[in-house]
Structure formats: structure tokens, C-alpha cells
């Protein structure tokens, strides 16, 4: 799991929420596939609304230019973001995201390697509504500040606990990575973050950094599928 702090600025979060306050939300079950429909109880912004499409495009632009998203996911394709809303008592039980998704209004499909939630409601404004992800270390509960995001493997079982007070609004999307192997993708992320840390602290010689960059890019070249 990768937490991305301040993916959106406070002003951007405010703009997103103001726009979403005026768009229609449909029953989230209408977009659930398979068994997920039986445990999904939320609202989802109408993806055909031009205002929602503008917000989705704005978020896509932010994702495509975020260094942590690029490093952690190595994106090949990103699904147009969806916006959901959980009011009091609404929840989404344990489910796994579909492996293959058709990109709306195109003949293209996407393999979901990584899932992302971008939190748009300040966490102090609602109770409950935690994203719970099953990992090899047990359940991990996530509730980020507004504007922050979490990136995690799409193969994970996960749920959103019932909102007991207030309202939770978030954006969700899925990413097809150039590196489909989860373990190798995580290793590449760790290597890249270590290189960036050495660059930032200025303790490594240029020759050493060149050597590490050489290893990193050759590993990406070997394991990527484009």
C-alpha cells in the first residue's frame, strides 16, 4: 500500500466538492459487477454528466503528473475516475475489484493491477467509512486526509465500513501497470524511492547514482509490457 499525501491541494478539494454537490448521484449497485452488487450500498456520480467528466479529466491529469503515482504504479492505462458518496448507514462489504474493465465509450479494456481511492471529505467530518484492506499482515484500516490518496493492489479483498455520522465522498480509479507482477512492481518502487532519497540528501556521488539509475531502468525494461 502506498499513501500519497496532498495529491490534491485544499483549494482543489474544495472545487471538487462544490462541483459534486450539484451533480446527480445514482445507486452505486448499477455499476457493480458480479457478487459485488450484493454488498454495495452507496451513491455514484453520474458518469455521463459533463461536470463529472470534467472532474474526472482533471483528476486524471493530476495522477499522470504525480511522481509517487508514476513510481509506485508505472501506469500504462488509468480508468476514468468515478466519484462515490456514502451517507449515514451506507457501506460496501468485502469484495475484490474486477480483473478486466472496459473503459467507458471506447473499445479498450484495462487490467486492474492497482486500485486507488482519493479522499475528498475531511476525515474529521464523518465517522466510520474506513477503507479496510486485507493484507498478508491482517486487516489494514485507512482513513486519509482530504486530498490524500491510497494506492493498493487490485487483487486485495477490501471493504468500506458503514458511515455512522456525516458523509464520505471520494474518487476511485484503477490502473493497469506496465509491470504486471506485483512483487517486482513493489521492488522497483522501493529502488526508485531509495534513489530519490539519495538524490535529495546529496550523499551519493554522481557515478554511484548513474549506476543505480542504470540498474533501475534496465529492470523496468526487462519486466515491463508495453
Curated annotation (Swiss-Prot):
One of its GO terms (molecular function) is iron ion binding. Pfam families: 2OG-FeII_Oxy_3 (PF13640), PKHD_C (PF18331). Its EC number is 1.14.11.-. 2-oxoglutarate binds at residue 168. Binds 1 Fe(2+) ion per subunit. Keywords: Dioxygenase, Iron, Metal-binding, Oxidoreductase, Vitamin C. Residues 77-177 form the Fe2OG dioxygenase domain. It comes from the Bacteria. Fe cation binds at residues 95, 97, 158. One of its GO terms (biological process) is intracellular iron ion homeostasis. Its cofactor is Fe(2+); L-ascorbate. InterPro entries: Oxoglu/Fe-dep_dioxygenase_dom, PKHD_C, PKHD_hydroxylase, Pro_4_hyd_alph, Pro_4_hyd_alph_FE2OG_OXY. PANTHER family: PKHD-TYPE HYDROXYLASE YBIX. This is PKHD-type hydroxylase MADE_1018490.
Amino acid at each position: 500500500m502506498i499513501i500519497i499525501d496532498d495529491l490534491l491541494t485544499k483549494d482543489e478539494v474544495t472545487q471538487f466538492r462544490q462541483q459534486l454537490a450539484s451533480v446527480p448521484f445514482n445507486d452505486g449497485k448499477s455499476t457493480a459487477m458480479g457478487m459485488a452488487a450484493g454488498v454495495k450500498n452507496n451513491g455514484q456520480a453520474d458518469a455521463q454528466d459533463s461536470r463529472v467528466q470534467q472532474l474526472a479529466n482533471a483528476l486524471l491529469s493530476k495522477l499522470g503528473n504525480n511522481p509517487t503515482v508514476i513510481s509506485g504504479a508505472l501506469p500504462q492505462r488509468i480508468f476514468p475516475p468515478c466519484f462515490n458518496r456514502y451517507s449515514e448507514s451506507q457501506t460496501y462489504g468485502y469484495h475484490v475489484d474486477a480483473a478486466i474493465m472496459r473503459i467507458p465509450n471506447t473499445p479498450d479494456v484495462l487490467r486492474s493491477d492497482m486500485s486507488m481511492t482519493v479522499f475528498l471529505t475531511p476525515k474529521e467530518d464523518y465517522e466510520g467509512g474506513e477503507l479496510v484492506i486485507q493484507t498478508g499482515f491482517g486487516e489494514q484500516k485507512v482513513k486519509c486526509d482530504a486530498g490524500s490518496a491510497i494506492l493498493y493492489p487490485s487483487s486485495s479483498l477490501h471493504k468500506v465500513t458503514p458511515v455512522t455520522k456525516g458523509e464520505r465522498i471520494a474518487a476511485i480509479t484503477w490502473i493497469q501497470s506496465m509491470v504486471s507482477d506485483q512483487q517486482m512492481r513493489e521492488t522497483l518502487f522501493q529502488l526508485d524511492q531509495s534513489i530519490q532519497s539519495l538524490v535529495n540528501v546529496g550523499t551519493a556521488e554522481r557515478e554511484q547514482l548513474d549506476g543505480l539509475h542504470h540498474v533501475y531502468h534496465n529492470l523496468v525494461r526487462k519486466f515491463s509490457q508495453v
